[in-house]
């Protein structure tokens, strides 16, 4: 006999289909491609570097607060009042033929004009430093863009700002490498690999020279006050040299602002890297036993100068770092140690002679 039919069962909720993962198409590599295969590099940017970059960006692009607008408005009203009062005094002196007062008004006008001119010049130089950050953002966008038409004009503007002549071999190689079918990303990338390294190499040489001078000065000088004054003077000179190489003319306030930004970046991200670099040397080469205390202090001062120069490069450079072309402290560490050892050996051998 056949079994009786079972009653119908109603479920409160509809059945849910289990999601099935879509399979990707199989990828095969040839023998030639397997030799050139390189795994994708994961950006392991330290958290302190990100905090430093955010702080620098906030300093370069300050928010227009209400208090700042009120102060600027008050200064503008005060300046207009001074100009109006000066015009009134000049008219009264001319009408009463008070030539002494008229001469005083003329002298005051010259002084005020010189002050206004210097303020405008400083503002223009400070604006140029801020504009470099915007150019770096624009270059970063072009390096990730597939559009056409902006890359060449942007790179030519950077070359003109840096004072690179049209007949320069690096710029000529760049012109020979680009063509109309390339997009902005490829054109800016070629500029970063062919023209920008010329300026970067000059900046590296300046950093090496100033770092070596700081190392040797601290190692041989017995006066701490002289050391501090020398290091401060040489660091400011280094910032000026790097800014000039990258086509930025620094005024008084822009120089102080750049120096503050560099120190801010070092305070956030420089201490850990500096201690790591010095620790590697001391552990691997036992420098603490071979060098004197003054020599060790000289190496520390030289590495700090190098760190300051690297950060000044980063703030003055019109292009972001690509393909791990950013200089590291290790690039200057071995050079500083070698120069210091050579100097100490010469100083020890000279009395024997």
Swiss-Prot record:
Places the protein is found: Cell inner membrane
Entry keywords, A to Z: Cell inner membrane, Cell membrane, Membrane, Transmembrane, Transmembrane helix
Disulfide bonds listed in the record: none
Keyword Ribosomal protein found: no
Positions of the UniProt region annotated as Disordered: 1-35
Keyword presence, Transmembrane helix: yes
InterPro entries, sorted: DUF697, UPF0283
Listed Basic and acidic residues bias regions: 1-19
TM regions (residue ranges): 70-90, 100-120, 213-233
Coiled coil: none
Entry membrane topology: Multi-pass membrane protein
One GO CC term, this protein: plasma membrane
Family recorded in the similarity comment: Belongs to the UPF0283 family.
Protein's name according to its UniProt entry: UPF0283 membrane protein YcjF
Species this protein is from: Salmonella paratyphi B (strain ATCC BAA-1250 / SPB7)
Gene label: ycjF
